Amino acid sequence: TVWLGSGTTTSCHHPPAHKIPVEELKRSYKALHNTEYKKLVRKQMLDGERPTECEYCWKIEDLGKDKVSDRVYKSVIYSDSALKEAKTKYDWTQDVDLKTLEIAFDANCNYACSYCNASFSTTWMNDIRKNGAYQNLVSDGARAFQQDGKWAQPYGVKNKDNPYTEAFWEWWTKELQYSLEELRVTGGEATMSQDFWKLMDWWQENPSCEVRLAVNSNLGPKPELMQRLCDATHSFKYFDLYTSNEATGLQAEYIRDGLVWDTWLSNCRKMMNEGNLREF
């Protein structure tokens, strides 16, 4: 995942993200993923060492051969030949060409879900800035409910003059549109990002693109954006849409502040009936 709004990246959802140095980005837009730090971790793995970031999977695998870690689940989507190529084609110092990439353009979001925080939602951010930090709330050491997440959007809600977003567009137009199998866009809420709609407009002008687009959405944007998303799917050869809920009705609305259950359900049906979806 690359969080373009904050200029951070990680290759898995278990390790913490690290900053992408702008100096590395100036040398190559591929540094959005191929940071010098990741290359050192890559070398550790090739040398048979265990990077500390991967301890979650090591612990699972050390429990016995019948225990399957996320490392296996994340790799099974690729063929054995593709995995072998990834190991043998590149020296650890080289920039790896990606097959899948997940990005978040920014943290703009119209929800404040209870399991989220201000680093990933501007609604959370605005709540803490207006009402102050949550008090007497048991949380982890990151103090997620005490901070306003300002580090996550240093370039503002419109990503003005963001070198990370600029690097993505350069990489996308020159290489990624030809080499990727899947591009996934998450958030925040994807439909609230102007860069997301820039990507949608690009696809409408380039409908022959073979890349599969996957979008994570809360399916709760304004009706005009919902219709725009539905219409845009017809410009794609392969469009996957992901949404989720942990409960139904009032319980779902309690967990996801901003959600209107009936609207979400209606939008799910709308996308399935009117959208051009490969997978939902």
Question: Which residue ranges define each predicted feature?
Answer:
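Cys/His-enriched microdomains
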Residues: 52-55, 107-114
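Detector for the c-type heme attachment site
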Residues: 58-62, 116-122
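Generic structural signal for well-ordered alpha-helices
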Residues: 169, 200, 226-230, 265-272
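Leucine-rich repeat
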Residues: 170-176, 200-206, 230-233
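Recognition helices and adjacent regulatory flanks at domain boundaries
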Residues: 64-99, 109-111, 132
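Accessory C-terminal segments flanking Radical SAM cores
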Residues: 1-78, 97
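Core AdoMet radical
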Residues: 98-108, 119-164, 178-194, 206-225, ...
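A Trp-anchored, charged/polar loop motif used as the substrate-binding/catalytic surface
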Residues: 81-92, 161-174, 223
